[in-house]
From Swiss-Prot:
UniProt protein name: Secretogranin-1
Subunit structure: Interacts with ITPR1 in the secretory granules.
Keywords: Cleavage on pair of basic residues, Disulfide bond, Glycoprotein, Phosphoprotein, Proteoglycan, Secreted, Signal, Sulfation
Bias (Acidic residues) ranges: 256-267
Keyword Mitochondrion in record: no
Pfam families assigned to the protein according to its UniProt record, in alphabetical order: Granin
Annotated positions of the Phosphoserine modification: 93, 99, 126, 179, 217, 306, 330, 375, 396, 399, 524-525, 606, 615, 620
A GO-annotated cellular component: secretory granule
One GO-annotated biological process of the protein: exocytosis
Species this protein is from: Sus scrofa (Pig)
Residues modified to Sulfotyrosine: Y557, Y613
Sites carrying sugar chains: S93, S234
Positions carrying Phosphothreonine: T79, T92
Biased composition (Polar residues): 188-200
Length: 668
């Protein structure tokens, strides 16, 4: 056991010496790494004569992977600091002048909160960002030297930790040697990947980064339109520089961490390069005091600079709302809410009007305008803009309340006479809210959508109103294509007499336009009136109001028509209507005669053969006696009665012939 411990100590000291030696032992270290790689590969390929893997090789392989990670991390940090040092001299002359007021305004919030940007982006590992002064880009200590010191201390701590791990590893080594030899292919492959690709990737990304920055810095001055845009760019870059140094301090969690940090840096440059910058020449004056202009007690600038800050020309604080990537902006806005309210109420009305009409005669408008002279159109515009501001997405409730109070104070400053910070008059406040909620005038499209027929009628009757009666070529009947309800609505208008010729015109149009239009044969005048219900409204119209004519809706019911209607569905309607009435009359007469003939024939037969036509009922003796008496009383038929019966029989035969004749014609 003691030789193993001594061997572990020896290996750890050798590894520490090799890693701590500078450039002189580099070749020896590379030879050791190559020898260890050969051993690992031969064991992985399970060669028979492969030498066993020594613990020194294991320590070298383990240390080599960490060295590659440290090298990539150091290269990444060096590229960041080099780019920053290259960028700082070009921007210092522009950032120092406009950022003075902003630093003074944000000093209290930064003292209370600490550096929020570095904490958020660095994920809590912001030792360098917290200890570094935020004033200018150049600090008293050299950041490269400080970074080198921190890296050296981290490396020494890592070596001590590795020595302890080496001792424990030597103790466990003998029991786990067989299982570990199978899995040693992965460290060998990662070592080769790091040696072959790591340095090339870092060098290549560094070159791309520097060339991209050179192209950006060369094309930047040509793209800037004015001093205002360059100041905006400098303000953005200083904000990103404050947040950037906190990122390299966080230790990498995996092997992709250095590459991800390099990609983040390149993405930041691309975002700064291609980010759209809106509102170059102007900004909204009612939002400018809230966005970034410091209060009057903190800014020591003359009146011209205050006007520029209202217009949004040189205040870098206005970039908070434009670039939502700076997260601490909403917190700072919430802290400065009271200062914003005080500064917005003190603002003079002339400055605001001049800012609104800055590019087109602002001074003349300010001179010509007097307090209390604002037109209703401007009031409406102010109310609509304040409502839109309050409804805008992406803002906190505090900022919306600030904007609402600010809009009220602006309104009082414009319309309220000499004292702009006076307490609000209730009459003025009522007038302001009435103007803000005044209904917007209806556009022509909405009006035409709601009143299309009235618009058409006005257009068609324009000539009659001007005195032209019956202009040639005009469409005289546009209402014929409208519904009956529109007729009624039109007739209730004064000066519109009822035209009686519209009914046939409408019918003719219906017959022409509808290919399936078949007028029914039983249509009467009542049904014609029913088709034009709206016209009947007009016929029954009195001075007191509209009275309905019940004939319009309830025509006279014809019972005969339902009796005449045939039961067969496939008959020809026109032929049946012409010939049905005489046949029915004849059939009724025939039925009556047939009934009479049948009765007489029955009486005659019953008289001749009384026993045959007997009902067959079993009569009681009393009833039988009565029937016999009746027969005796009746006696035999007289000659006159017999003649009548013969005549009736002849008539019956004739009627039967006539009926057969009619039925034959009907079948044929």
């Amino acid at each position: 056991m003691q030789p193993a411990v001594l061997l572990g100590f020896l290996g750890a000291t050798v590894v520490a010496a090799v890693s701590s030696m500078p450039v002189d032992n580099r070749n020896h270290n590379e030879e050791m790494v190559a020898h260890c790689i050969i051993e690992v590969l031969s064991n992985a390929l399970s060669k028979s004569n492969a030498p066993p893997i020594t613990p020194e090789c294991r320590q070298v392989l383990k240390k080599g992977g960490k060295e590659v990670k440290d090298e990539e991390k150091g290269a990444n940090e060096n590229t960041r600091f080099e780019v920053r040092l290259l960028r700082d001299p070009a921007d210092t002359s522009e950032t120092q002048r406009p950022s003075g007021g902003r630093e003074g305004a944000e000093a209290p919030s930064e003292d209370t909160q600490g550096p929020p940007g570095a904490d958020v982006e660095g994920g809590g590992h912001s030792r360098e960002g917290a200890g570094k002064p935020r004033g200018g880009p150049y600090s008293s200590d050299n950041p490269v030297a400080k970074e080198g010191k921190t890296r050296h201390s981290e490396k020494s701590e890592g070596q001590d930790r590795e020595e302890e791990e080496g001792e424990k590893y030597q103790k466990r080594e003998r029991g786990e040697e067989g299982s570990e030899e199978r899995h040693l292919q992965e460290p060998g492959e990662t070592q080769t990947a790091f040696l072959n690709q790591g340095n090339r990737a870092t060098a290549k990304k560094k070159e791309e980064f520097e060339s991209r920055y050179d192209a950006h810095s060369a094309g930047g001055p040509a793209k800037t339109h004015s001093r205002e845009r360059s100041s905006q760019e400098s303000g953005e870059e200083t904000g990103s520089q404050d947040a950037a140094p906190g990122e390299p301090e966080s230790p990498p969690e995996g092997q992709e961490a250095p590459e991800e940090s390099q990609e983040d840096a390149s993405l930041e440059v691309d975002k700064r390069r291609w980010r759209p910058r809106h509102h170059h020449g102007r900004s909204r004056p009612d939002r400018a005091p809230q966005e970034g202009s410091p209060p009057p007690e903190e800014r020591g600038h003359p009146r011209e600079e205050s006007e520029e800050s209202v217009l949004g020309l040189a205040s870098p604080g206005g970039q908070r709302t434009r670039h939502p990537t700076h997260y601490p902006a909403s917190e700072e806005e919430a802290e400065h809410g009271e200062e914003v309210r005080s500064s917005s109420s003190v603002q003079a009305p002339g400055d605001l009007v001049g800012a609104r009409y800055g590019g087109r005669g602002g001074a003349e408008h300010r001179a010509a305008r007097r307090p209390g002279e604002e037109s209703p159109e401007q009031d409406r515009r102010v109310g609509a803009s304040s409502e839109l501001r309050n409804k805008g997405p992406g803002h906190s409730e505090e900022s919306e309340e600030e904007r609402g109070d600010e809009g009220q104070r602006h309104h009082r400053a414009w319309a309220g006479g000499p004292r702009a910070d006076a307490p609000p008059d209730p009459a003025e406040e009522e007038q302001f809210w009435g103007e803000a909620h005044r209904p917007v005038p209806e556009s022509q499209v909405d009006e035409a959508r709601r009143h299309p027929q009235a618009k058409l009628r006005n257009y068609l009757n324009r000539g009659e109103e001007n005195g032209e009666e019956g202009a040639p070529g005009r469409w005289q009947q546009p209402e014929d294509l409208q519904g009956p309800g529109e007729h009624a609505a039109e007739a209730r208008l004064p000066g519109k007499p009822y035209a009686a010729h519209r009914i046939p015109e409408k019918k003719r149009l219906g017959e022409l336009l509808n290919p399936y239009y078949v007028p029914p044969q039983w249509e009467s005048s009542h049904f014609e009136r029913k088709d034009n219900v709206g016209d009947n409204f007009l016929e029954g119209e009195d001075a007191n109001g509209v009275t309905l004519n019940e004939k319009t809706f309830f025509p006279e019911y014809s019972y005969d028509w339902w009796e005449k209607k045939p039961f067969e569905e496939d008959v020809n309607w026109g032929y049946e209507e012409r010939n049905l009435a005489p046949k029915l009359d004849l059939k009724r007469q025939y039925d009556r005669v047939a009934e009479l003939d049948q009765l007489l024939h029955y009486r005659k037969k019953s008289a001749e053969f009384p026993d045959f036509y007997d009902s067959g009922e079993h009569l009681s003796p009393r009833h039988a006696a009565e029937s016999e008496k009746e027969r005796a009383g009746q006696g035999v038929l007289t000659e006159e009665e017999e003649k009548e019966l013969e005549n009736l029989a002849a008539m019956d035969l004739e009627l039967q012939k006539i009926a057969e004749k009619f039925s034959g014609n009907r079948r044929g």
